[in-house]
Amino acid sequence: MPKIKTNRGAAKRFKKTASGFKRKQAFKNHILTKKSSKTIRKLRPKQEVHENDVALVKRMMPYA
């Protein structure tokens, strides 16, 4: 039986950790001039994927 393909977009966006999957915070790529320094600072740290979405990410990354 052939191997299951990994979704390459998901592989670039998520990283497996011991407690789940790590992801980058959204809304921090461009159009940052109208956002305050406080808002940009709050968007800086990585976050965990929500428990409702973990099954979807696991399906996209079967070998993670």
Curated annotation (Swiss-Prot):
Keywords: Ribonucleoprotein, Ribosomal protein. GO terms for biological process: translation. InterPro entries: Ribosomal_bL35 (IPR001706), Ribosomal_bL35-like (IPR021137), Ribosomal_bL35_CS (IPR018265), Ribosomal_bL35_sf (IPR037229). GO terms for molecular function: structural constituent of ribosome. GO terms for cellular component: cytosolic large ribosomal subunit. The keyword Ribonucleoprotein applies. Coiled coil: none annotated. HAMAP family: Ribosomal_bL35. PANTHER family: 54S RIBOSOMAL PROTEIN BL35M (PTHR33343), LARGE RIBOSOMAL SUBUNIT PROTEIN BL35M (PTHR33343:SF1). Belongs to the bacterial ribosomal protein bL35 family. This is Large ribosomal subunit protein bL35. The gene is rpmI.
